[in-house]
Amino acid sequence: MPESKYRQQTIRAPRGTVLTAKSWLTEAPLRMLMNNLDPDVAENPHELVVYGGIGRAARNWECYDAIVDALTRLEADETLLIQSGKPVGVFKTHDNAPRVLIANSNLVPHWATWEHFNELDAKGLAMYGQMTAGSWIYIGSQGIVQGTYETFVEAGCQHYNGTLAGRWVLTAGLGGMGGAQPLAATLAGACSLTIECQQSRIDFCLRTRYVDEQAATLDDALARITRYTREGKAVSVALCANAADILPELVNRGVRPDLVTDQTSAHDPLHGYLPSGWRWEEYQKNAQSDPHGTMQAAKRSMAAHVRAMLAFSKMGVPTFDYGNNIRQMAKEMGVENAFDFPGFVPAYIRPLFCRGIGPFRWVALSGDPQDIYKTDAKVKEIVAEDKHLHHWLDMARERIHFQGLPARICWVGLEWRQKLGLAFNEMVRCGEVSAPIVIGRDHLDSGSVASPNRETEAMRDGSDAVSDWPLLNALLNTASGATWVSLHHGGGVGMGFSQHAGMVIVCDGTDEAAARIRRVLHNDPATGVMRHADAGYDLAVECAVEQGLNLPMVAATQGKG
């Protein structure tokens, strides 16, 4: 690895109200960049890796230093441009323009392959930004807990009469994203068995209470699951092993889970999925010396993994892909029916997307957990009738360990995001919280992503692969005045399979911030309603009418028919 991609340095975002940069609008991206690399947040901060295989916050350490320097000196009417983790320019714009514009991992489609990307990465010409790693709004595993929780709850409604009590989930992967699964299952009332090949990741999840227990062997794990489900307890169990070995063994034994999914880093066969029979150190070494052979070995193991998932599905066990592209990898290795089980979005989440409901998250730049608890109370006050949301916030406060700067996530839609943002801004203005708050989201949202094997799988009109939508989302957020806007490629599912956009806006208590919040936090989720209404979803059309959207080709929004 080039020296510039490794540095033995501990980074933590500043806390409190003393500015390092010239304003809160530049202090915010500076703190969030640093927060992404906090050792309590990032998977491998010394190599700038935040999560998701090789999802990095900056291209190399020289680029990181230059970004920090640029943000520190950036004026109120200037915009910093980031090209795949490298600061390439500062330009005069205006006060309401974004302070940072980010483009990560974008390749011309014909060349959008892991092989070509890895060549560029090795030359220092590119960086994989994942979704929130390179866009500086990662908040640790909490960032996906509620989405996973909502998925499990909906699965319980569809398959088990509304409850997962006495049921168990079989899955794999305890990285930055997958680590949310066991806690989400517990919060949804289910037991879970999560297979993870790296003991260090299990240790982290045990320490942060995302996992309750570790089993010594498969027999021990199954005995625990049997006991807890019989007792009606929701307990999460981790097992250090390879999913490509364990799932086929469970099929051979005739073991029948109640839900099966997966969140290994299968999207990146060179860095994210340990081939069966290999040690992790061997995998890392071979990735350098024989990348093609390593990728093929990983994909062969994925094929075995998916065949086992297909076997569970054939047994009648609800089985779904949780967005890591493992079905595609298996299909490339000859598993022709890999897509016989669905992805989680068409199976459980799309009705939420139709209403612009998605992962709304915010971070207290003060570093004070009390600021988050106060905003939790404000959300309950404003969204007063949503008891499901209140239950989520109560559970989150009790069970979720803050990683880095205190943060919260809750899934809310077009109707509420603007109202919550304005309320948070007012809390900053009147001193109810001790410092500004940033509001962002995952790129996994209703209008900000094109990903035919994940968020846009099986769209009603067949527009799964149309990536105009995330481009329009990024352009509109830029025009609306988001504090920083990002446009990425390959997040979640790997090179060639997705394009997606993100935005973050700062609530600094000013009238100018309030005006930007009104635009951004309405327009951003509205693009999701627009995208789904355009695809012919009645629920999205109804939401568009209710919220007064002007969609020229959707007759109902024009007062016709």
Swiss-Prot record:
- Residues of the active site are C410
Report the GO terms under cellular component. Answer: cytoplasm
Co-factor binding details: Binds 1 NAD(+) per subunit.
| One Pfam family recorded for the sequence | Urocanase
Q: Which terms does the UniProt entry file under GO BP?
A: L-histidine catabolic process to glutamate and formamide; L-histidine catabolic process to glutamate and formate
Q: What is its EC number?
A: 4.2.1.49
Q: Which cofactor does it need?
A: NAD(+)
**Matching InterPro entries:** Urocanase, Urocanase-like, Urocanase_C, Urocanase_central_sf, Urocanase_CS, Urocanase_N, Urocanase_Rossmann-like, Urocanase_sf
The reply on keyword Calcium is no
Q: What EC class does the entry list?
A: lyase
Q: Which residues bind NAD(+)?
A: 52-53, 130, 176-178, 196, 201, 242-243, 263-267, 273-274, 322, 492
Which pathway is it part of? Amino-acid degradation; L-histidine degradation into L-glutamate; N-formimidoyl-L-glutamate from L-histidine: step 2/3
Q: Which domain of life is it from?
A: Bacteria
Q: Name one GO molecular function term.
A: urocanate hydratase activity
Q: Transmembrane helix: present as a keyword of the record?
A: no
Where does it reside? Answer: Cytoplasm
What is the annotated role of this protein in its UniProt record? Catalyzes the conversion of urocanate to 4-imidazolone-5-propionate.
Q: Check the record and name the NCBIfam families matching this protein.
A: hutU, PRK05414.1
Q: What family does this chain come from, according to its entry? A: Belongs to the urocanase family.
Q: What is this protein called?
A: Urocanate hydratase
The organism's lineage is:
Bacteria, Pseudomonadati, Pseudomonadota, Gammaproteobacteria, Enterobacterales
